[in-house]
Amino acid sequence: MLAKFGLCAVFLVLGTAATFDTDPEEASPRRARFSSNSPSDVARCLNGALAVGCGTFACLENSTCDTDGMHDICQLFFHTAATFNTQGKTFVKESLRCIANGVTSKVFQTIRRCGVFQRMISEVQEECYSRLDICGVARSNPEAIGEVVQVPAHFPNRYYSTLLQSLLACDEETVAVVRAGLVARLGPDMETLFQLLQNKHCPQGSNQGPNSAPAGWRWPMGSPPSFKIQPSMRGRDPTHLFARKRSVEALERVME
């Protein structure tokens, strides 16, 4: 339980600047259309892309529907594939193919509305990870999964969030592996935060919620951030965690 709570701290820190409780369909005018590619262009690209490799996910990049992110995850898996064992190599190949096929098969049903399209991609991603046993792969390939589960170079990345949440649903041992990998990359400050959070135990019946901080701790913005960590993609806010940053920035530009 402590390991899972510690991993939640990663969401807390990485999502602070990117999360606000807004309606996903009204978050920003940018969600109403694609920038470089129209919906028909995106659909055509997806239908013409090969299911093997990262071509399918390249079709999702650079759009105002904020569907960027899966291409980066795909490349991370491919770059680290050689370090996985046989089970892991199979997972890399089959999970990417599963997600690509799932997204392509449902694109025409969902692409007219950004929120529905985003949610569909995340649901397909989570379903493929679960079906192909991402937890077992992470347990038997701790170093390789640690290379994959690193902070993305560009935010927001809602699909990185889905990857982390899929691992967070695993057993304690797997969660501990993911946590250790993130701490190693984020440095001693993250380890200190884990310790602060893990040393603060709330008794049953306490009024303290998950945003309560240990004595002496101050949130950088004066109050804890508001965000959602949801156990399943079913009914999940498609703009969770990192996904809202660009929408908020765009809204601010419009209001200036």
From Swiss-Prot:
Organs and tissues of expression: Produced and secreted by the corpuscles of Stannius.
Carbohydrate attachment residues: N62
Keyword Secreted among record annotations: yes
Organism domain of life: Eukaryota
GO biological process: calcium ion transport; intracellular calcium ion homeostasis; negative regulation of calcium ion transport
Annotated propeptide span(s): 19-33
Localization per record: Secreted
Major place of residence: secreted
GO cellular component annotations of the record: extracellular space
InterPro entries: Stanniocalcin
UniProt GO MF annotations: hormone activity
Signal peptide: 1-18
Pfam family for this entry, one: Stanniocalcin
UniProt keywords, alphabetically: Calcium, Calcium transport, Disulfide bond, Glycoprotein, Hormone, Ion transport, Secreted, Signal, Transport
Function, in words: Its primary function is the prevention of hypercalcemia. Upon release into the circulation, it lowers calcium transport by the gills, thereby reducing its rate of influx from the environment into the extracellular compartment. STC also stimulates phosphate reabsorption by renal proximal tubules. The consequence of this action is increased levels of plasma phosphate, which combines with excess calcium and promotes its disposal into bone and scales.
Family listed: Belongs to the stanniocalcin family.
Protein name: Stanniocalcin
